[in-house]
Each structure stands twice: as C-alpha cells, then as structure tokens.
Amino acid sequence: ENDRIEAVALAVPVTLQGRTGCYLYGLTGQGSLILAGLVDHLCAQQRAKGAGFVVTVPTGPEQAALLQDKGFQWAFPLRCLPREVERNLWSQAEFDSVTAKKLCELRERFWPDTVQLDPERMAVVLGDLYSAGATIVSSEHGYGIYFREEDTLYFVELQADTDRAAEVLMEAAREKEVIVEKAVITVGASQTLFLGEGTRQEYGMIRFDGEPFDVTESYMRLMLEG
C-alpha cells in the first residue's frame, strides 16, 4: 500500500512425521488485520502446494492470540532447567565437528518426531548459531549446542541416549570453557532427559490444513528465529 510493505513473512518447507508442511518465518506486519490477511494468504498458498500443516514461533502474546484466531494451537513446549556441572577430567567429547547435514541426522536419530528443516536451511541456522558464539559438543551418545555467559553454559539444544551421556557432554564443555560451574538447559517438554525437572514454557504453534495428527510428543527448536 502506497509503496510500503505492510506485512511480511517467509514460508519455509519443513517435514514432521513423514508429512510435508511449512514454517512461517519472520511474521511481522503493521496492524492485526493486515497480518491476519497475510497468514490466510500464505496458508492457502502452501495448502495448494500440498502442505498439510503450518508451524511458527510467535513473537509474543499478541501475535499468539492472532494466530489462535487463525486456527493455530500451541504445540512443541519446552522445559528449562538449571544444573550444576561437575568437574570430570575423564569426560571426553568433540567440539564444533557437526555439519548441517550431520545435525539433521542427529536430530533424526535422537528425536525422529522433530520438525525438520532440510540440510541447506539448517546450514543457515548453524551459521547463525556459530556467528552468535555457539559451540557444539558431541559424542557417540549425544550432542549439545550451547552458549557460554560468564560461569554458565546455556544449552539451547541437548539430545543424548541417557542422563549420564548428557552430563558427560556438559562436563566436557566445562573442561573446555574452564571457568564454568553450572548450566541452564532447554529441552523438549516430553524429552526423556532429566524427566520431571525444570519449568515448562510454550514455544511453537501449529495449524493443520490437512488431516490433524498427534503432536503431543513432537519437538521443534532452532527454527531460524534467532
């Protein structure tokens, strides 16, 4: 309108449980009516291309309410939990050896029920993480993506076979970062790591444009939103 962009969003292809869908990225606009119209347009466009669902990460309560009016519902909750990190010189792991393709494979292995970007788009996510100072720690039994702030490791994703395997990753990261004593971990609410610990928080939303399916155990994270 008047050569001004009133609303913008990008529809990015994703998969979940073998189904094709899309992720609405960067949804912003001037006024709720314009934004609602854009959501309608994009969802219809993606449905015509065969997308059975649309996922997104709302920027705040106001946008979440607008999306709910458009048929979206909360999904993919997270758990945030603090952990003390023990000193253990025997805990070994590799650092920053994970490629975008490998990260997609690791997610498929540790949590197949995950909203997946393709490796090309995951490379963009990985590049943004590294640019922001992230480190990836990995072993045969798991991997974690973390940022260090002062004496704390902030894990934005952590997947492992067992609680102990996850602790080994954190202990190896502590040895690398030297001054670290604790970690704050964000995992999927239904993830089996440190089950029963942490505070639940909402994260993503989904709208079904095809046959609805069960996403109560599904996971979504690191979706280009920075």
What are these regions (language model features)?
Residues 37-53, 168-181:
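Conserved acyl-CoA
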Residues 103, 165-169:
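Hydrophobic side chains in well-ordered alpha-helices
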Residues 54-57, 116, 138, 145, ...:
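A structural signal for short, well-ordered beta-strand segments and their strand-loop junctions
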Residues 1-40, 131-165:
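Conserved donor-binding loop and adjoining core beta-sheet/short helix segment
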Residues 47, 70-154:
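Amide-forming acyltransferase catalytic core, primarily the GNAT-like/NAT-type
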Residues 57-60, 64-92, 159-163, 171-226:
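Active-site/acyl-donor-binding loops of N-acyltransferases
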Residues 28, 39-43, 64, 68:
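Short, well-ordered alpha-helical packing segments
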